[in-house]
Swiss-Prot record:
Keywords: Disulfide bond, Knottin, Secreted, Signal, Toxin
Entry comment describing in which tissues the protein is expressed: Expressed by the venom gland.
Protein name (Swiss-Prot/TrEMBL): U3-lycotoxin-Ls1j
MF annotations from Gene Ontology: toxin activity
Disulfide bond annotation, renumbered to this chain: 48-63, 55-72, 62-87, 74-85
Entry comment, domain topic: The presence of a 'disulfide through disulfide knot' structurally defines this protein as a knottin.
Location(s), subcellular: Secreted
Signal sequence annotation: 1-20
Major location (coarse): secreted
InterPro entries listed in its UniProt record: Spider_toxin_CSTX_knottin, Spider_toxin_CSTX_Knottin_CS
Length: 115
């Protein structure tokens, strides 16, 4: 019985050591990928398209608002055959931003009252 217990402890220790090494390898690869993604994001952030401007050249270039990124929305104007694309914010996200702003203001008032 003691042998089985010692063998089990040995296997658990060996497994945890090998999985820790694999996780370290994955973490290093993830860090490298993350750094390259951050560099790309910083480069892309400088060229964002403001809200209500044409985004047909790059549909993923809309600027971020306080909480959410704008969405490139395409439509056909009335009586026109050409497609027009502009950066816009969906209404539900607009309302969520307004609610978050009001909650933040209310939280500040509560902090003043009790803080």
């Amino acid at each position: 019985m003691k042998f089985v217990l010692l063998f089990g402890v040995f296997l658990v220790t060996l497994f945890s050591y090998s999985s820790a090494e694999m996780l370290d390898d994955f973490d290093q690869a993830d860090e490298d990928e993350l750094l390259s993604l951050i560099e790309k994001e910083e480069a892309r952030a400088k060229e964002c398209t403001p809200r209500f401007y044409d985004c047909s050249h790059d549909r993923h270039s809309c600027c971020r608002s306080e909480l959410f990124k704008g969405v490139c929305t395409c439509f056909y104007p009335e009586g026109g055959d050409n497609e027009v694309c502009t950066c816009q914010q969906p209404k539900h996200l607009k309302y969520m931003e307004k609610a978050a702003g009001k909650a933040k203001k209310f939280g500040g008032k509560i902090k003043k009252w009790f803080g």
